[in-house]
Amino acid sequence: MAKKSKIAKLAKQRALVAKYADLRATLKAEGNYAALAELPKDSSPVRLRNRDLIDGRPRSFMRKFGMSRINFRELAHKGQIPGVKKASW
């Protein structure tokens, strides 16, 4: 489980990225890099870290499911992820 402060920081960053997304896109298309540099650092989507939506774990993140391998395995065994079943060959 990640620290609550890290999870809160991620939520704040996501809100900031969403807030400035349109402005950032127009400035980038115009080539106005000076104005882009004036925007908050955390408004850049590159600075976001993929984290598990359940417990905030930053490593071993699976993009397709939005969770770490640990939570994925746990929920898959319980049958709580639609379309996922244990492989057998």
UniProtKB/Swiss-Prot annotation:
Keywords from the named record: Ribonucleoprotein, Ribosomal protein, RNA-binding, rRNA-binding
Q: Which family does it belong to?
A: Belongs to the universal ribosomal protein uS14 family.
Please report the organism this UniProt entry assigns to the protein: Latilactobacillus sakei subsp. sakei (strain 23K) (Lactobacillus sakei subsp. sakei)
> What terms describe the molecular function in GO for this protein?
rRNA binding; structural constituent of ribosome
User: Self-association or partners: how does it assemble?
Assistant: Part of the 30S ribosomal subunit. Contacts proteins S3 and S10.
* Purpose: Binds 16S rRNA, required for the assembly of 30S particles and may also be responsible for determining the conformation of the 16S rRNA at the A site.
PANTHER family xrefs: 30S RIBOSOMAL PROTEIN S14, SMALL RIBOSOMAL SUBUNIT PROTEIN US14M
Name of the protein this chain belongs to: Small ribosomal subunit protein uS14
What GO cellular component term, any one, is given?
Answer: small ribosomal subunit
Any Pfam family: Ribosomal_S14
Report the SUPFAM superfamilies cross-referenced here.
Glucocorticoid receptor-like (DNA-binding domain) (SSF57716)
Which Gene3D superfamilies does the entry mention?
30s Ribosomal Protein S14, Chain N
InterPro entries cross-referenced by the UniProt entry: Ribosomal_uS14, Ribosomal_uS14_bac/plastid, Ribosomal_uS14_sf
- Domain of life of the native organism: Bacteria
Which GO annotations describe the biological process of this protein?
translation
